[in-house]
Regions:
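Well-ordered beta-sheet/strand-loop patches within structured domains
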Residues: 1-215
């Protein structure tokens, strides 16, 4: 969402969790849950959340694993200072929308079982993971699957890109960042960038394992 934008940074994915708990961030507890608790003291209980008292009188809130969990069945972890990650979602119908800026900064994955199997096969090719094998793990207990070799993650923000069919795609600038980029391209530093792009050689190399659509 424009009010909670996804940060731009690079890191390395180290593991994934099947059947994750969702530890609700303090900002969401304060801004979204406490007002609803004032209206209905049983609000969290009705949704299956666990409330854990903390020292100093505060509370921690978490949602147990399951089909209603806000993270879905899988979350993909690359520990970072922004507390964001990739994850499944129980509201898969939102992927049918043309505009999908609904999150608090994390990125939702449309086909998490396929994505998990692909990543695990990249780092552990002898294990022969399949989406079916991943789904067989779904349950009520967390399962950590660590990568022997971390996988690089680069989160970018693009409002124009070329799709797999070679067609130019344009998206709305929901974060309002295009103006700054256009200004950069028009100044002297932009000339340097144009020179780099003009002399760059295109690369047609494909990854060894095909990454599924829907991320």
């Amino acid at each position: 969402k424009p009010t909670t934008p996804t940060p731009i940074f690079s890191n390395a994915m180290q593991f994934l969790i099947v059947n994750p708990y969702w530890n609700v961030p303090p900002s969401i507890i304060k801004k979204e849950m406490l007002p609803k608790l004032k209206e209905d003291p049983d609000y969290l209980k009705k949704l299956g959340y666990e409330v854990i008292p903390q020292h100093g009188g505060g509370i921690a809130v978490r949602q147990p694993p399951g089909e209603r969990n806000a993270l879905g069945w899988i979350k993909f972890m690359f520990p970072n200072d922004h507390a964001v990650y990739l994850h499944d979602t129980p509201t898969r119908n939102l992927f049918a929308n043309g505009k999908r800026a609904f999150s608090h900064g994390c990125q939702r994955v449309q086909n998490p079982d396929q994505y998990a199997a692909t990543l695990l096969n990249i780092t552990m090719p002898n294990e022969h993971y399949t989406p079916e094998k991943i789904r067989a793990m779904y349950g009520r207990s967390e399962i950590d699957l660590k990568f022997p070799t971390p996988i690089p993650v680069n989160i970018t923000y693009q409002t124009a890109f070329v799709d797999d069919a070679g067609k130019l795609q344009i998206r709305k600038d929901v974060y309002g960042r295009d103006a700054a980029m256009i200004a950069l391209l028009r100044n002297s530093r932009g000339k340097d960038l144009e020179n780099v792009v003009a002399h760059a050689q295109p690369s047609y190399a494909r990854p060894r394992a095909e990454i599924p659509q829907g991320v």
